[in-house]
Amino acid sequence: MNKANLFIISAPSGAGKTSLVRALVKALAEIKISISHTTRPKRPGDQEGVDYFFIDETRFQAMVKEGAFLEHATIYERHYGTEKDWVLRQLKAGRDVLLEIDWQGARQIRELFPPALSIFILPPSIEALRERLIKRRQDDTAIIEQRLALAREEMAHYKEFDYLVVNDNFDQAVQNLIHIISAERLQRDVQEKKLSRLLAELVEKQ
């Protein structure tokens, strides 16, 4: 069985994480993105089972008690959680898994899976982040300022991550993510299992 990788991508609200992740998954083969469960309401364009699994507070808390989540966190008074069984099944089958979660969840995952590789997406500036939140047209000015304050708190945890990617130029940011994941897949301990037959043939004495 091939060794599977667990990747984490986190970012403050408005940094473009979701768009980057979608482009990354489209560009890279053999990587599965975990779909989180959430109690937040659907937004226009959200698809059940594609963007999130939308559940109510009662069901979410029941899943917490059942130990169904690998990690869970509260963001803007809404709950988000990563289903444990699905992730473990993918890893056991040798498939790379990508988690799109916040820094709280990333911390929990690293405690459970120390080899997990984590990437934090940064905006090019606070003003750029503010402009992106305004262009969403989802919140009023007061809420946007609250989100910016929380974003500063989130970005203060950047040192907990392995890589930092600034989303200034979208295409370049996608390429940076591809390079990071490709390099991780080429590490010796990963390649050693994938290339076991070739390596045996190359080094075996005749």
UniProtKB/Swiss-Prot annotation:
EC number(s) of the enzyme? 2.7.4.8
Q: Where in the cell is it found?
A: Cytoplasm
Q: Name where it mostly resides.
A: cytoplasm
SMART domains linked to this entry? GuKc
SUPFAM superfamilies listed in its UniProt record: P-loop containing nucleoside triphosphate hydrolases
Domain Guanylate kinase-like stretches? 4-182
Quote the record's binding site residues for ATP: 11-18
Q: Which GO terms describe its molecular function?
A: ATP binding; guanylate kinase activity
KW Zinc-finger (keyword) present: no
Supply the Gene3D superfamilies for this chain: Guanylate Kinase phosphate binding domain, P-loop containing nucleotide triphosphate hydrolases
PANTHER family in the record: GUANYLATE KINASE (PTHR23117:SF13), GUANYLATE KINASE-RELATED (PTHR23117)
Q: Which family does it belong to?
A: Belongs to the guanylate kinase family.
Name of the protein in question: Guanylate kinase
- Name the source organism: Coxiella burnetii (strain RSA 493 / Nine Mile phase I)
Q: What is the lineage of its organism?
A: Bacteria, Pseudomonadati, Pseudomonadota, Gammaproteobacteria, Legionellales
